[in-house]
Each structure stands twice: as C-alpha cells, then as structure tokens.
Amino acid sequence: MQGDVRLAVDQGARAIGLIDGAFEYVAPVWHKEILYGLSKGVAVFGAASMGALRAAECHAFGMIGIGEIFAAYASEIRVDDADVALLHGPKELGYIAITVPMVNVDATIAGCCTRGLISAREARHLKESARSLFFKARSWNAVVANCSEIASGRANELLRILRHNYVDQKNADAMALIDALRHADAYSPPTHFEFNRTSLWRDD
C-alpha cells in the first residue's frame, strides 16, 4: 500500500520487491516513493501485478522489471491495468483467487493453443469472451458460458482443458522476482535523475 516503499527505504532496506496491491479500496504504492528509493541507491524490483505496472512506468529511472507480464506492459503489448486484477477471498482463507485475471487467461489459452488442445478460432473467441467480462465476474465457467460461438457439446470439454492446463503467469512472475531478490546485491540502480521534493512529499 502507499507509503510501504518509503518506510522500507527509511528503515534501511537495500532491495525491495513489489508484487501486488489491493485494487479499488487501498491506495497503491506511489511512483514518487519508488523514485525516492532509487535515488537512495535501493534496488527496486517489480513483477506480476501492481509491481509489473510500476516497473513498466519507472523502468527508465532504474526500477527492475521481472517476468512476462512486465515485458508485455513495458513493450505496450498490454496497456490495460485491469488485466492483472482479480477477486480474491479474505485473509482467513489465504486470499484464495475467486476469479481469473486476464494475464492468466491469455497465458493459459496460448499454452493450450500451442499444444493443439484448442483451435485458433476457439482461442480467439475465448479471449474475446474473457475480455468482455468485468474482472470480478471472470471465472472459467463465465468465460465459456459467455462464448456463444462455442457449441454446447464442446463447452464442457473446453472447461476441462482450461482448468487442467491453467497457467498462473502472475505466480510464475512473482516467484521469478523472489529469485531475483536473492541476487539483489548484483544490482546497482543508476541515479541519473534528481529526486525533487514537492508539496506532497516532505522529509519529516
């Protein structure tokens, strides 16, 4: 949440990994605090979700992006912030995922298509169906049910294929970031910019 990165920097962190945040109800990590950390020589990594978004936005200042999702945003192949959003359960249930983020939909469908489990036509229709759904309503059941171009006799088979071959790209990228943090000492962020205080940023 907003302020966490600044607090970590002020407490002496030398490397910070940013993965996810809570959408809608909690203020996310601010770009300014990331720049603050970079200006102090702290290696700041981002991946998977909010971390990938911030890394794509702050890469030019030295933030280190990790993974496929970051690469897609950095190259502007992917532009919608909501593509990483999902609905999850409460802390008591381990924040279990209830819906499927678009980045995982795309990765899963691409994998199934590459292995010949679904056709290019089915892949296209499934992606269109998934993208038309609000992130809080995007489950595999909803994606397939919302896809009118899929014959009813094929729907159950598609659902089985998608679930059995699910690719959790967010998790894969998050694990890659954790691995990168183990070698964080090898990174030294460039400080080719001047960090400017503003009316919204004070040192006290």
Predicted regions and their residues:
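Accessory terminal and edge-of-domain segments that mediate assembly/interaction
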Residues: 1-17, 26, 31, 87-204
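Metabolite-binding pocket within alpha/beta catalytic cores that recognizes anionic/polar moieties
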Residues: 3-81
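Residues forming well-ordered secondary-structure scaffolds
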Residues: 64, 79-82, 100-107
